[in-house]
Design a protein with these regions (language model features):
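Non-catalytic, well-ordered alpha-helical scaffold segments
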Residues: 67, 71, 106, 111-118, ...
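Short pre-active-site segment immediately N-terminal to the catalytic Zn-binding motif
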Residues: 53-69
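Post-HEXXH active-site segment of zinc metalloproteases
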Residues: 78-115
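A charge-rich, low-complexity, intrinsically flexible signal that marks solvent-exposed coils, linkers
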Residues: 280-283, 287-316
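Short helix/loop segments within enzyme catalytic domains
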Residues: 119-143
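Auxiliary, metal-adjacent structural segments of Zn-dependent hydrolase domains
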Residues: 1-49, 62, 103-105, 124-126, ...
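Pan-zinc metallopeptidase signature
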Residues: 139-264, 277-294
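Active-site recognition of the HExxH zinc-binding catalytic motif
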Residues: 64-84
Length: 319
């Protein structure tokens, strides 16, 4: 793995890199770990935090390195900005189940980011017609994976792949997909309509779209006779509220729900803080189950939202 210095990067990438570092006080290091790639995919550059102030980016596609690097830097910039995020502090007790829910949620989350990133990459010149063609070739290959799945699960999988292809590929292959995969196309169309009904640069609308797409995807799963994924109570999604709401008592906006899952940190019963307007958990509370009594609820609910958020260290965004 080779570290890339700024003098080895295109001018536009260096400028993007320096803007992020200056705006957010982070140091970003770029590494090349090139491998043979049959298709261009959006995960051929990835990043991870290295302590509080360092972010490491690793690129694996040499031919399209400028595109995948610019793409990953746009993801980093969105994550560092005022954008809602997904977290999870509970467990089903089965690692595979936990991973499946998080994988789906993260896929939807990244697709929502892609709705903004595709516009940025067209504007900065890194997403050309040639790159789009290669990206869509990869999506087409992903829609016919070399794995055995039953029909319903193949449709669930294709729906998420197609959703991302519609968003980042700007509907260019819709006609082919509708012909070849009509049911998955119908499902994906329902989801992409939610994407396109919201201004995803606005945190409140990004969160609304995220919750609504997960809801719609869950309905697709249930309609095929499978058990739902419990996105509302398994995941926490950053709340976006007004300053006025911070002064309200907790029970005016949120309710505490004794979770069907266990607190991952303690192994004990978990308690979710659920938004009353959309039923989505915003946090897993640090409560001792032995002390959660009717009297506790009565007293806890009288605290202001701001007091609870501060006491429970709950991240929030102002609408």
């Amino acid at each position: 793995m080779k570290k890339l210095n700024n003098n080895e990067l295109p001018t536009n990438i260096v400028k993007q890199l320096e803007n992020i570092e200056q705006q957010y006080g982070k140091k970003i290091e770029i590494y090349a770990d090139y491998t043979d790639q049959e298709f261009l995919t959006l995960d051929q550059a990835n990043h991870q935090a290295k302590g509080e102030d360092m972010i490491q980016v690793i690129i694996t596609n040499e031919k399209y390195n400028d595109f995948v690097l610019a793409h990953e830097l746009h993801h980093i910039e969105l994550e560092l900005s005022d954008e809602p995020s997904i977290s999870c502090a509970v467990t089903t007790g089965k690692q595979d189940n936990d991973g499946r829910v998080l994988s789906i949620a993260n896929s939807v989350f990244e697709t929502l980011e892609h709705a903004t990133i595709v516009k940025e990459q067209i504007a900065d010149g890194t997403f050309t017609d040639a790159v789009k063609a290669e990206y869509l070739r990869g999506i087409d290959a992903a829609l016919t994976p070399k794995v055995q799945l039953d029909l319903a699960n193949m449709r669930f999988y294709r729906t998420l792949i197609m959703l991302d292809g519609m968003v980042f590929g700007q509907h260019e292959h819709d006609e082919d997909w509708q012909h070849n995969f009509p049911t998955s196309f119908k499902y994906a169309t329902k989801l992409v309509e939610i994407v396109e009904q919201n201004d995803l640069t606005v945190p409140f609308q990004f969160r609304r779209a995220l919750v609504n797409i997960l809801d719609a995807y869950n309905e697709i799963i249930i309609s095929n006779g499978y058990q739902g994924m419990h996105f509302h109570t398994f995941l926490n999604i950053t709340p976006v509220i007004s300053k006025r709401q911070l002064r309200l008592s907790l029970n005016q906006v949120y309710q505490i729900k004794h979770s069907e899952f266990k607190n991952r940190a303690t192994g004990k019963d978990a308690f979710d803080l659920i938004a009353m307007n959309d039923g989505q958990s915003i946090a897993t509370l640090n409560l001792d189950p032995a002390k959660v009594t009717p009297e506790f609820y009565k007293a806890f609910y009288q605290h202001t939202i701001e007091e609870v958020f501060k006491g429970e260290d709950i991240k929030y965004l102002i609408r």
